[in-house]
Amino acid sequence: MVNPLNKYFRKPAISISLPTQGEFYAPGALTFDNDKELNVFPMTARDEMMMNSPDALMNSSATIDVIKSCVPGIRDPWSMPVIDLDTVLLGVRIASLGESMDISVIVPKVEETISYTVDLRVMMDQIDRSQFNPYVVLEPTLTVKVKPMSYRQLTNLQLRTYEQQRMITQVAQGKMSASEKNKEFNEIFNRMTNLTLDNMKEGVLEINADGDVITENTYISEFVDNMQAEMASKIRTHIDSQNSLGKIKPITVQVPEDMVKKGAPTTFGSPLSLDNSNFFVRKS
């Protein structure tokens, strides 16, 4: 029997197109609703409560659940390239709470707080949708093909980085000798180095060497471990620059004249964080 209340269920509020156009997703992880677009539903009451749960936000499980709920075409948000993340979260925010958003920012020089209204549709339009370039030419006969970082990869990297930073603080504040601290710091540094290299290895799809295409993970891992630092820097710089595609631009804030007279700049840029509960707070 069909629920007689189903006509009151939430319906798609907007549709979005992804910066990646659906590339780099795992098989079966994405189903477009119409012509390379995805429908976005408003958040449910449960979704809003999830986005205000600090524990769930810490490991990104709240964000994953909300994306599954509001953008059901993304069947596996963990495999979503981070390039698409800002577009998806902006879409959920607009569908749920509207196109405008009030934020508070601290004005440089005078250190005073002002409120500012952001047009999220404009921010969506300003997102860089340039095509991801997967190729890094290291030498005329050596080219590395990379992929965007996935949301799972980003989350794991953030959690592991946070854990190492927390350990640095604990060691610095701990009651141990200087030599013991140096030993602990060296171990933490080694783990951070391995974390960076592991992240790079995960981002490499294949390597073309003298016309031979190598996709074997073991060979790729050995190459990353043994290549010269200049090559590693080139790969890392390329991946970082390409992963920045799809990001929202900082907000340009106009400063009130009275604050400018006190020494504040006429305008300044302010970043807007999307992947946290503040972005999804409903006005009371």
Give a label for each model feature.
Residues 1-284:
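Long C-terminal interaction/binding lobes of large macromolecular proteins
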